[in-house]
């Protein structure tokens, strides 16, 4: 059974390996990219593990009173098991009552519905946000005023 924990610098090679496996077309981040980002202040990285093997990762960063959810990646064979939802909940808990912003692919309606369940509302379409001219939908959750859904 998988578990989620806060990532350490030692996890970054496994995170970069997953990134390369999942984002073959869209220009994956390198290990150096992850190391640089991880070292910045106000970063929050999580990993999902199954029997010691890292199977997914998520990240966020805080700037003033806003938290940006930046990454949420799970190996294909572990999807649809609630890992992404748990990543979201942990990052919302870390965000506290700050405003939370995220971007997701326009065609990823399943995840958009999950975000809506947790209080996110669409705010704008970001053309050419992802490689290969793929648009993103920006979604925002204003300052936390209610508890998270079960």
Which residue ranges define each predicted feature?
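Conserved acetyl-CoA-binding loop-helix of GNAT-fold acetyltransferases
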Residues: 74, 80-93, 109, 113-117
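Short secondary-structure capping/turn micro-motifs that flank functional sites
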Residues: 35-36, 108, 131-132
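Intrinsically disordered, low-complexity acidic/proline-/asparagine-rich linker or regulatory tail/stalk regions
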Residues: 148-150
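Acetyl-CoA-dependent GNAT
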Residues: 2, 6, 10-77, 88-90, ...
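Conserved catalytic-core motifs of GNAT/GCN5-like acyltransferases
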Residues: 101-104, 116, 121-138
């Amino acid at each position: 059974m998988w578990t989620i924990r806060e990532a350490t610098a030692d996890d970054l090679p496994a995170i970069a390996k997953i990134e390369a496996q999942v984002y073959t077309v869209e220009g994956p981040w390198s290990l150096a990219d992850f190391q640089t980002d991880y070292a910045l202040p106000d970063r929050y990285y999580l990993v999902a593990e199954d029997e010691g093997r890292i199977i997914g990762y998520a990240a966020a960063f805080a700037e003033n009173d806003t938290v940006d959810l930046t990454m949420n990646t799970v190996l294909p064979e572990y999807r649809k098991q609630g890992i992404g939802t748990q990543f979201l909940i942990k990052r919302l808990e870390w965000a506290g009552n700050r405003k939370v912003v995220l971007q997701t692919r326009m065609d990823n309606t399943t995840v958009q519905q999950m975000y809506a369940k947790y209080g996110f509302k669409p705010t704008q379409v970001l053309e050419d946000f992802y490689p290969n001219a793929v648009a993103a939908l920006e979604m925002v959750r204003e300052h936390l005023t209610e508890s998270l859904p079960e």
